[in-house]
Structure formats: structure tokens, C-alpha cells
UniProtKB/Swiss-Prot annotation:
Role noted for this protein: Plays a role in myelin formation.
Record's keyword terms, sorted: Cell membrane, Glycoprotein, Membrane, Transmembrane, Transmembrane helix
Signal sequence residues: none
Cytoplasmic face residues: 50-100
S-S pairs: none
Descriptive protein name: Noncompact myelin-associated protein
Amino acid sequence: MTTATTLGDAVFSLNMTRGEDALYKSSGAIVAAIVVVVIIIVTLVLILLKMYNRRMRTRRELEPKSPKPPVPPALDPSSNGSQQPATVTFDPANVHVETR
């Protein structure tokens, strides 16, 4: 396709060959093919991850369960097994605020 345009005394000619025209027309098909390939690759990766997850879960469920490790004794020997959580009490009367 040849188009001639006159602007004042200059003539501009635009030549589009059949190869360029075919390339412009097929660029949409190329993009669509790339998108399809990417979707196929992502699908395959998800299927592989699902199979791996299923295999690891069955392996964890089938392996013998080891008993829990023994609980370490209390640090204070005089506690005699009765452990009470440490408590902190807050008394506002004991708080000294510096005045300026």
C-alpha cells in the first residue's frame, strides 16, 4: 500500500510492504499464543505443587509419631512441682511523676 501526501512543496511517501502488513496482522495471534503458553505453564506448576503437597501430607501421616520430649524440671528446686505464674501488680500510688 502506497500513500502519497503533499505538504507544501514536499511529497512524503509511505510504503508498507506485504511483510510488514502480515506482521502487524499476526502480532495479536503471537500475543495470544504467548498468553496460552504462560497459562499452561502456571497450570502445570500448580498441579505439581498439589501432587507434592499430597505426597508430603501422606508421608507425615504415615510416619510413626515420636513421643514428646520430657519437660525439663523447674529451675527452682524448692518449687516442688507447683508452678505458679509470676504476677506483676501495679500500684499507682508508688509511681513518682517528676513535675516541672
